[in-house]
Amino acid sequence: MSKNVVSLVKDDSDKKKALDAALSQIERSFGKGSIMRLGKNEQIVEIESVSTGSLGLDIALGIGGLPRGRIIEIYGPESSGKTTLALQTVAEAQKSGGVCAFVDAEHALDPIYARKLGVQLDDLLISQPDTGEQALEIADTLVRSGAVDVLVIDSVAALTPKAELEGEMGDSLPGLQARLMSQALRKLTGSISKSNTMVIFINQIRMKIGVMFGSPETTTGGNALKFYASVRLDIRRIGAIKDRDEVVGNQTRVKVVKNKVAPPFKQVEFDIMYGEGISKMGELVDLGSKAGIVEKSGSWFSYNSQRIGQGRENAKQFLRDNPEMAAEIEAAIRANAGLIAEKIMDVPGSERDGDEDAGDMEASA
């Protein structure tokens, strides 16, 4: 019996020696840190994040924002708030001293609106490339530099391959953009992780032709981005915010369709006000009510037995005028983030957009 135990220990020690030899050989060949034990350095497990500018969305994402060193996809219909959400993330990154870049493939960035959202234009790197290849090459160079914290590419649909630009107007080039994206993401994904750069791809929605069952909606650029993205956000405009007869903002719903760093399928709603961006005060009222921090009785809202307004808009205005109370409510909401996360859990289900072959025919939404 003891003989078997001794031989087992011997086998284990031989296995350990063989493993140590293999690890040292890998480190000699590919450099120190190319392979390591996951639990040895706990900082490796920690995922750094950048706030989205929305308190509710930060809670829904599970790590306090969008993860750094990962690929993010934000998609939705036109005028749903995709670029606004990306610019708010850029503004939050700049507040903490981050370097941000914006690859404007659509040639549609409004610098005045970006400034209103809090983006420091003097520190923002911007590129307006002519072709999809040029845009992705610029993105690759910026990521490899290791000096950029957040890189936004707006949008995947506007990354037109050079062959398509040089061809005739009616030429059929199926799958060309999908192949371009697939090759670029294979090249980018390793350097994104090493440089700890967050790359946000903004994408548009198309309708698949001839779909009888399920949603006909899909995103442009093939399937590669769906696989490589660690977080996918589906953003929709669900209503208008009016001041008397004038529309002053949009009610917006964001669903976390995919999340590799925390449980997915949570969804949040917030207001995007024109010329202001995501309404922080509106979120404090809504999330505070869900967590029981802000009491609601009829149409009246109150905090610590003090009435703060009749109706949601009046409560928002009261918090704008009383920043100390707003800060107190925000701190209480952050302390109860786990409870709120449970309340905003959506019904689990698969991604609504079906798989898209490289050569699928697409029609504009």
Curated annotation (Swiss-Prot):
It is found in: Cytoplasm. Keywords: ATP-binding, Cytoplasm, DNA damage, DNA recombination, DNA repair, DNA-binding, Nucleotide-binding, SOS response. One of its GO terms (cellular component) is cytosol. ATP binds at G76, P77, E78, S79, S80, G81, K82, T83. Residues 353-365 have a biased composition (Acidic residues). GO terms for molecular function: ATP binding; ATP hydrolysis activity; ATP-dependent DNA damage sensor activity; damaged DNA binding; single-stranded DNA binding. Transmembrane segments: none annotated. PANTHER family: MITOCHONDRIAL DNA REPAIR PROTEIN RECA HOMOLOG-RELATED (PTHR45900:SF1), RECA (PTHR45900). Belongs to the RecA family. Can catalyze the hydrolysis of ATP in the presence of single-stranded DNA, the ATP-dependent uptake of single-stranded DNA by duplex DNA, and the ATP-dependent hybridization of homologous single-stranded DNAs. It interacts with LexA causing its activation and leading to its autocatalytic cleavage. This is Protein RecA.
